[in-house]
Swiss-Prot record:
Any one GO CC term of the record: cytosol
GO terms for MF: methionyl-tRNA formyltransferase activity
Listed InterPro entries: Fmt, Formyl_trans_C, Formyl_trans_C_sf, Formyl_transf_N, Formyl_transf_N_sf, Formyl_transferase-like_C_sf, GART_AS, Met-tRNA-FMT_C
Enzyme class: transferase
Gene responsible for this protein: fmt
Organism: Anaeromyxobacter dehalogenans (strain 2CP-1 / ATCC BAA-258)
Record's catalysed reaction(s): L-methionyl-tRNA(fMet) + (6R)-10-formyltetrahydrofolate = N-formyl-L-methionyl-tRNA(fMet) + (6S)-5,6,7,8-tetrahydrofolate + H(+)
EC nos: 2.1.2.9
4Fe-4S recorded as keyword: no
Lineage, highest ranks first: Bacteria, Pseudomonadati, Myxococcota, Myxococcia, Myxococcales
Annotated protein name in UniProt: Methionyl-tRNA formyltransferase
Length: 312
């Protein structure tokens, strides 16, 4: 097939690799514009643009996608289908309907669960044990189109969104190629989503990483895993931000007496922090504002205290 590909970050590159291996003709790669990144705020090109440049595939980076200009450019390339993977923009009807097979989306969840911009992060943060990828026929709604094909994937006990994303991306590439094969053969049966089962994976905000110690330890641990690498998990210690880098539910440690947020040294292991429901979180690695990352025990040794309160 002649494919016009719309995608921006590293997650989308696995789909490009899969399309290339399967012998599809990529007529263009559409990515978001280069953006400032890093401490120096130098312009950085999207991962998909780098992939395309290395192979001589034409790249488009429009600032706007709903003014008709992009639709006209793609229509001139006569693609058989548009493939969208983490492009980061909402497409209008002119784009969704310009190719004979419409627009197919590679989405990082088992729709209708986790519609929206951060499906991988929220699946992990909400403690789910299974997720997957969906190949969807796009419509004008937010991930509301018919499901064409799905593949499930287990979320490991120690998975973070960072470790899970590459596996989902690879699975998405495989599912995409299979869906295109079935589409060409006329063997796909679109399935309407059950809106009553939908959940929203909204865009993450910095404040999502703030730890509420009144939550059970398991919930705090899941959110730490889901929000790694950003926004992470953080609290405060005497007015200074304290990032919690590594922690797990402390089922085998005693819960410190007192209110949620009370922390107590567990010799040789870390800090036990009182959480909601009488549970404890065993914190093993942290980073105090203005300091490098360190073990939780080193933090306590530096404070010369065996017990203190977090969230203050």
């Amino acid at each position: 097939m002649r494919i016009a590909f719309l995608g921006t970050p590293a997650f989308a590159v696995a789909a490009l690799d899969a399309l290339e291996r399967a012998g599809h003709a990529l007529v263009t790669v559409v990515a978001q514009p280069d953006r400032p990144a890093g401490r120096g705020q130098a312009l950085r090109e999207p991962a998909t643009k780098a992939w395309a440049r290395a192979r001589g595939v034409p790249v488009l980076q429009p600032e706007k996608v709903r003014d008709g200009t992009l639709a006209a450019a793609l229509r001139a390339l006569a693609p058989d289908a548009l493939v969208v993977a983490a492009y980061g923009r909402i497409l209008g009807k002119d784009l969704l309907t310009l190719a004979p097979h419409g627009a197919l989306n590679v989405h990082g969840s088992l729709l209708p669960r986790w519609r929206g911009a951060a499906p991988i992060q929220w699946a992990v943060a909400e403690g789910e044990r299974e997720t997957g990828v969906t190949i969807m026929q796009m419509d004008e709604g937010l991930d509301t189109g018919d499901v064409l094909l799905q593949r499930a994937l287990e979320i490991g006990e120690d998975d973070t969104s960072e470790t899970l994303a590459p596996r989902l991306a690879a699975l998405g590439g495989e599912a995409l190629v299979e869906a295109l094969r079935l589409l060409e053969a006329g063997a796909l049966v679109p399935v309407r989503q059950d809106a009553a089962q939908a959940t929203l994976a909204r865009i993450l905000e910095k404040e999502d990483g703030r730890i509420a110690w009144t939550r059970p330890a398991r919930r705090i641990s899941d959110r730490l895993r889901g929000f790694t690498p950003w926004p992470g998990a953080f609290t405060t210690l005497e007015g200074r931000t304290l990032k919690v880098l590594e922690a797990r539910p402390g089922a085998d440690v005693a819960t410190p007496a007192g209110e949620p947020g009370e922390a107590e040294v567990v010799p040789g292991r870390g800090l036990a922090v009182a959480c909601g429901g009488g549970s404890a979180l065993l914190v093993t690695r942290v980073q105090l504002e203005g300091r490098p990352a360190q073990s939780a025990l080193d933090l306590a040794n530096g404070l010369r205290r065996k017990r203190f309160r977090l969230g203050t």
